[in-house]
């Protein structure tokens, strides 16, 4: 391989690592590995900032239900705000929109108000953020600025990267009530109409206009 070709290959890899990959469901490595609870030494956000954010508590998740094929990975992640740690593979009983984001990710910042509007308009669908390798105080400050009140968990060590096969953020998963991932959006969502349409198409829930 010539130096020029090697440089082009390296540049393409860096581009993919810096932003979401092409739209599509892709393949997930889920439902087959042993349960994991990543360790973290990251300090939680300040209590006064959490009080200002008024985040909903993280949802309860079933610790005993077996993971499903093509479901969320069997990872237990700490809550960014109040509430228990969340076992992703144990989220059942309601459709979920799960958004991987970070305060350092520019397209993620643009998406958050869209998810906040969906959360306010559609109680039949639960939203959960996964804040990736972020400063918790910066993350909560962004949620305040974006009007987000739905909960997020913290992925301080990028534990979701291998099972969900993501190369960049944001990434959004549409998960049915039985825990099966119906669709993975690997590119930024750029409009409310696009997000609402994805919810209606893959979760079967009509979003009020």
Residue positions per predicted region:
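N-terminal targeting signals for export/organelle localization
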Residues: 1-78
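Hydrophobic alpha-helical membrane segments, chiefly transmembrane helices and signal peptide h-regions
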Residues: 6-18, 100, 114, 130-132, ...
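Residue-level recognition of short loop/turn positions
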Residues: 18, 81-82, 178
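A short beta-strand-turn-helix
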Residues: 66-69, 74-96
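Soluble periplasmic/extracytoplasmic beta-strand elements of cell-envelope proteins
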Residues: 76-78, 129, 173, 183-184
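Short active-site neighborhood of thiol/selenol oxidoreductases, capturing the structured segment around
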Residues: 86-109, 115
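Structural microenvironment flanking redox-active thiols in thiol-disulfide oxidoreductases
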Residues: 109-146, 156-162
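Thiol/disulfide oxidoreductase modules built on the thioredoxin-like
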Residues: 141-148, 155-209
